[in-house]
Amino acid sequence: IGIESTIVDLTEDIPMILRPGYITPKMLEKVIGEVKMDPGIIASDSLQKPKAPGMKYKHYAPKADLILVDGEEEKVVAKINALAKEAVLLGKKVGIIGTDETIDRYPEGEVVSIGARSDEDAIAKHLYKLLRDFDEKEVDIIYSESFATPRIGQAIMNRLLKAAGHQVITV
């Protein structure tokens, strides 16, 4: 579906999710009871190193810098528009990842929809393809809305954070 599998360490008393994926913590808890998250996949600082090998480095990153913008939808759209306008004025080619609900509100740059915000499966499925498409379009910088959706949103955000090298602007 675009997002890799969930990795779970079962060698401890309480199983630990080493990489969030399509199987959510709630799904696991229904089958095996309490689970915890590897602190290294939650923390953005370099002090907490993830245990899963594929989680330790900037992963599936596009060639362009990727910056996530997180917050309330209206503020996110306004901030991405301001950042995109500034980048265009500096002569940069801008990519923007929005949703079906927001793409019409971005006048600058190469704007693509990752899907409907409510369709987590589509977001997960299209994530890496969109990043590769921006490579082909040779954009200099990509601004993306955040996708903290309730079901597999944690896995989606985990992959976006890794691709962005944890560059996040909160508005």
Label the predicted regions:
Residues 1-171:
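Active-site-adjacent structural elements in enzyme catalytic cores
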